[in-house]
């Protein structure tokens, strides 16, 4: 597990690149997502094709993956900062929602947070490292300007972060799709 400090108050973004069932998950979901209609109709922060907030697909692989995300949460040192200062019993975390985002050329996501959730995650199901990154924006007090922390969209990478962190995705400029699965945890 890797982490990157995002803000001066020690909030961190955690990520890992080796989900061991990535190929099975991709095989199970790719056709469903590539051909999915834009249920959200670009009325959310995601200006790309998006599924329902709770993806409507029966998938053993997706169920295993979501359980793996909750297991990943068990390894995060929650004393390193977050949106909420009260102690969270990590054994009681549960998945609130899980949706897919399908970025085609010209698509993007505007700056937003996932409040009132506690933690959120993004998984790069189909991507290349040169595709649009996930950007976490913050105010640099010392330099008195906005800065960004860039997370490369490496296929099979899971990124977990406090839901209060501002994040966005720049315009996707490639012909192939960039597909993520995202969710919130409480």
Q: Residue locations for each model-derived region?
A:
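Non-heme Fe(II)/2-oxoglutarate
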Residues: 1-90, 108
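Catalytic core of non-heme Fe(II) oxygenases with the double-stranded beta-helix
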Residues: 92-171, 176-180, 186
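Short beta-strand-to-coil "C-cap" segments at the C-terminal boundary of structured domains/repeats
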Residues: 18, 185-186
């Amino acid at each position: 597990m890797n982490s990157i400090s995002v803000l001066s108050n020690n909030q961190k973004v955690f990520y890992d690149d080796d989900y061991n069932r990535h190929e099975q998950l991709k095989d199970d979901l790719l056709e469903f997502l590539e051909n999915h209609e834009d249920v959200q109709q670009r009325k959310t922060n995601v200006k790309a094709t998006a599924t329902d907030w709770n993806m409507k697909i029966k998938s053993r692989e997706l169920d295993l993956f979501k359980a793996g995300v909750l297991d990943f949460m068990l390894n995060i040192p929650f004393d390193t900062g977050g949106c909420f200062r009260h102690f969270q019993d990590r054994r009681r975390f549960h998945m609130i929602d899980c949706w897919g985002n399908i970025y085609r050329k010209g698509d993007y996501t505007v700056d937003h947070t996932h409040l009132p959730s506690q933690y959120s995650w993004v998984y790069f199901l189909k991507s290349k490292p040169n595709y649009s990154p996930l950007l976490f924006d913050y105010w640099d007090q010392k330099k008195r300007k906005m800065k960004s922390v860039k997370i490369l969209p490496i296929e099979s990478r899971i990124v977990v972060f406090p839901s209060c962190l501002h994040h966005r995705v720049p315009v996707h400029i490639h012909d192939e799709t960039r597909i993520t699965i995202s969710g919130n945890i409480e």
